[in-house]
């Protein structure tokens, strides 16, 4: 049993002072506000629930910053994708484990306590399945176990190079599965996370480019009631190609032909009409927004104000993992809306309300829904995922309650996280994960070889 005491903590009911939290077997057993610290309590100033990065491609952390040279032609998502394919083709299972471990350490240091790993690097370099088809999934699970982050594993089905069942490109060979192979992969992935505390599983049809309607219908039952994530309408070209194939836009097609509901998460959904935004919001599906990656790749800006106004739910993901941070993603999301609408505090819940708090609340609830977490936050029964902030940071000085969140997101950024408990285990202290040094050494050794 662990007893923590916080001068101020954000509970599901709102802020409370002098809060004692009792942790048993990795879960929150008791939350008692309005009490003085007892002998043996570990005391901290500000406590928040940990957030989820609902969308991650862990292996891409290894190539962060390596695609910033302009090519001969217009540089776009599609030219970046070619660089990503080349990097993916070189990686071994040991490389994937090393890169994912450091990534998850970094996520925890930034206040992410769960990750939705949209995992599509499945096979050996020649495209043939490993003897254990779940080899790469097992390496992701090992990385999660080593770091302490909670894992929602989302094995991705990827069969085609474009709409209408087009043949895949040679550089996509490590991703490609038949429906039968994917069923075996999902089964192996379940085994990989079976003993992992806090882990669960869903599926991720990669995109309408990569899966036919018949294949989509065939694989959805493999989710077995778990989350279903899919990339949708990230790029203008994707929308144009979908229109040429079907006469419909990607989100429009999904809403009319797939059983999209609260289990689903549409990643990006950047290029949508007003009608799509409203219909999407009504399904209860989550918009998986990855503002830093969307900016990095030149994708565009999601219609967040309109989506939230229609009652939509969103969470945040780190996607390409070019930069990892709770505050960074939420700040980029709000600043993108400010640039789009030429206004300030666009995603605030109303006059006199904190923008940072609104962003945080959406990310907490939307991330939990997208990753099938029934109980989340500082409440009895929830996994004990807790983040404390360093109130000595100059950007948090003199702040209280919602103003602390504003100071963290819009000013202090990545430097403000102090301690993190993941499943009741204190994995970060003084802003530093206990595995940071060894994880960095393994990562550096892998990446030096990969880029040589």
Residue ranges of each PLM-predicted region?
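N-terminal metal-binding scaffold of metallo-dependent hydrolase/deaminase domains
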Residues: 1-37, 46-47
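C-terminal cap of metal-dependent C-N hydrolases
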Residues: 383-440
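His/Asp/Glu-enriched, well-ordered alpha-helical/loop segment
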Residues: 256-259, 263, 305-393
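Histidine-centered catalytic micro-motifs
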Residues: 49-61, 227-236
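Alpha-helical scaffold segments that flank or form the walls of functional sites
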Residues: 65-150, 180-196, 444-452
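Histidine/acidic-residue-rich catalytic or RNA/ligand-binding cores of hydrolases
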Residues: 236-248, 276-281, 298-307, 322-341, ...
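Active-site gating loops and adjacent loop-to-helix segments of metal-dependent hydrolytic enzymes
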Residues: 62-97, 124-133, 160-180, 236-261, ...
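Metal-coordinating catalytic core of metallo-dependent amide/deamination hydrolases
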Residues: 123-269
């Amino acid at each position: 049993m662990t007893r923590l005491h916080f001068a101020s903590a954000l509970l599901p009911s709102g802020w409370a002072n002098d809060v004692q939290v009792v942790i048993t077997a990795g879960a929150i057993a008791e939350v008692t506000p309005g009490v003085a610290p007892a002998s043996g309590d570990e005391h901290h100033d500000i406590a928040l629930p940990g957030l989820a990065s609902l969308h991650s491609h862990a292996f891409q952390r290894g190539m962060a910053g390596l695609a910033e040279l302009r090519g001969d032609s217009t540089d776009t998502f599609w030219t970046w994708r070619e660089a990503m394919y080349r990097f993916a083709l070189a990686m071994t299972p040991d490389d994937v484990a090393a890169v994912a471990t450091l990534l998850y350490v970094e996520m925890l240091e930034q206040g992410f306590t769960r990750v939705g790993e949209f995992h599509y690097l499945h096979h050996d370099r020649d495209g043939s399945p490993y003897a254990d088809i779940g080899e790469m999934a097992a390496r992701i699970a090992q990385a999660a176990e080593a770091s302490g982050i909670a894992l929602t594993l989302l094995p991705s089905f990827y069969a085609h190079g474009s709409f209408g069942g087009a043949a895949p490109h040679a550089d996509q060979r490590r991703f490609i599965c038949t429906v039968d192979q994917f069923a075996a992969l999902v089964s192996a992935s379940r085994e990989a996370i079976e003993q992992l505390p806090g882990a669960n599983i869903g599926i991720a049809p990669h995109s309408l480019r990569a899966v036919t309607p018949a294949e989509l219908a065939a694989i959805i039952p493999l989710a077995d009631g778990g989350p279903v994530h899919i990339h949708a309408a990230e790029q203008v070209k994707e929308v144009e190609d979908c229109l040429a194939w079907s006469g419909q836009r990607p989100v429009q097609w999904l809403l009319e032909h797939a059983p999209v509901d609260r289990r689903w998460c549409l990643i990006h959904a950047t290029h949508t009409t007003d009608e799509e935004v409203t219909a999407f919001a009504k399904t209860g599906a989550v918009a998986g927004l990855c503002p830093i990656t969307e900016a990095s790749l030149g994708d565009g800006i999601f219609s967040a104000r309109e989506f939230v106004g229609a009652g939509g739910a969103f969470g945040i993901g780190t996607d390409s993992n070019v930069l990892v941070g709770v505050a960074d993603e939420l700040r980029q999301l709000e600043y993108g809306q400010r640039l789009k609408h030429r206004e300030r505090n666009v995603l605030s819940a109303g006059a006199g309300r904190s923008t940072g708090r609104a962003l945080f609340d959406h990310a907490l609830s939307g991330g939990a829904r997208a990753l099938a977490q029934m109980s989340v936050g500082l409440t009895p029964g929830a996994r004990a995922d807790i983040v404390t902030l360093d109130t000595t940071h100059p950007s948090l000085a003199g702040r209280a309650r919602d103003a602390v969140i504003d100071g963290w997101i819009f000013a202090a950024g990545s430097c403000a996280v102090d301690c993190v408990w993941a499943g009741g285990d204190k994995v970060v202290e003084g802003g530093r994960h206990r595995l940071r040094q060894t994880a960095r050494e393994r990562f550096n050794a892998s990446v030096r070889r990969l880029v040589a």
